[in-house]
Amino acid sequence: MNIRGLVLLFVLMTSIFLSGCSNDVAKRPDLKSDYEFEAVINYGDKAFNICCVKESEQWKFTYKSPAQLIDMEVILENENYKISYNGLIQEGLRSEMPDSNICDFVARSLEYITRGKGIEFHKKDDIIIGNGVFDGGDLKVTYDKNRLPKEIIIGKDIEIKFNSFKKV
């Protein structure tokens, strides 16, 4: 998986978690509350573990592949960012990131998706399902009866399953 693919997964995971919805059928977790989660990302024949924890006023996302080929940490705090990717560190103000910067890609994608546009929601029994398109692939998000995310599927290659999702 290339870095853009990894960042897309990061963007999707965080944006699905943080985004608001465009109608009343599916209400997401309240952003005034704090949630943490652990999940497994299956991308083709590769698997990655992801963990999101809230520390003070910042969100900290960590990614590790089982073979330790990828070790990535992203910290978003107010208007600041810090990314550590396999030991390389980059940080600064999100507003001052150059357009070609991968961090800017993360920030712009988060901003776009968190508006809740482009995803349609419907309820089936006690489960809420969101359908849309993300980066050219079909997107399906499944929430449990408590409106917490359980599974995300993008196209035919990417599947994200949450092991835990809890309020802190």
Predicted segments — roles?
Residues 60-65, 72, 117-168:
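Gly/Pro-enriched, hydrophobic low-complexity segments
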Residues 52-108, 112, 158-159:
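An acidic-aromatic
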Residues 1-7:
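Bacterial N-terminal signal peptides that target proteins for export
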